[in-house]
C-alpha cells in the first residue's frame, strides 16, 4: 500500500512540474483575413462545426487545452491543422484545400479522437455528403 502511495505521489509531482512547461499555452487566434466563397450559410455552419477548431483562426480552446500534457497535443493538432488547411486565410495559398472533400468522404476528417471529445462535430451521412459535395465544388482537383 505504501508503494502505491509513493508512486501516486511521484506521478502527481510529475504532472505538477509538467504544468510549468510553457509549451501548449499559445491559445491565440490570429485575425481572419479571408474565407473561401461559401456556397451557402449551411455549408459554412457545417464546416464551423466539424472543421474550424483545427482548420481556422477561430479555434474554441477547450479547458483541457490549458492542462499539460493534453495542452501540448491540442496545440500541436491546431498548428498542424492550420498548416494543412486554414479556412481563415484564403488570401494565402491553401495547397491542401483540394483534398478536403476526399478527407471528409473517407472519414479521415473530422478526426475520430476530436469527434469523441466534441460530439457536435459528428456529421450525419446527409451532412457529410453535403460537405463533400460543397468542398469538391469549392476546391476542384
PLM regions and their residue ranges:
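Hydrophobic membrane-insertion alpha-helices, especially the h-region
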Residues: 6-22
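Positively charged n-region of N-terminal signal peptides that target proteins for export
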Residues: 1-4
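The canonical Cys-X-X-Cys-His
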Residues: 47-59, 109, 131
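Extracytoplasmic electron-transfer domains, predominantly the class I c-type cytochrome c fold
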Residues: 72-118
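Polytopic transmembrane helical bundles with strong interfacial aromatic enrichment
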Residues: 20-23, 139-141
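C-terminal capping alpha-helices of c-type cytochrome domains
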Residues: 107-108, 115-141
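Electrostatic cytochrome c docking/interface patches
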Residues: 26-47
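Acidic helix-start/capping segments at beta-turn-to-alpha-helix junctions
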Residues: 61-76
Amino acid at each position: 500500500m505504501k508503494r502505491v502511495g509513493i508512486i501516486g505521489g511521484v506521478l502527481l509531482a510529475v504532472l505538477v512540474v509538467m504544468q510549468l512547461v510553457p509549451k501548449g499555452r499559445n491559445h491565440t487566434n490570429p485575425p481572419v483575413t479571408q474565407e473561401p466563397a461559401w456556397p451557402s450559410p449551411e455549408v459554412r455552419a457545417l464546416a464551423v462545426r466539424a472543421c474550424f477548431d483545427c482548420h481556422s483562426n477561430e479555434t474554441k480552446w477547450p479547458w483541457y487545452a490549458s492542462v499539460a500534457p493534453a495542452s501540448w497535443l491540442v496545440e500541436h493538432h491546431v498548428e498542424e491543422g492550420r498548416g494543412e488547411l486554414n479556412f481563415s486565410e484564403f488570401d494565402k495559398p491553401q495547397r491542401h484545400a483540394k483534398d478536403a472533400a476526399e478527407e471528409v468522404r473517407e472519414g479521415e476528417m473530422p478526426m475520430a479522437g476530436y469527434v469523441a471529445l466534441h460530439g457536435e462535430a459528428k456529421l450525419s451521412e446527409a451532412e457529410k455528403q453535403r460537405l463533400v459535395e460543397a468542398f469538391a465544388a469549392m476546391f476542384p482537383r
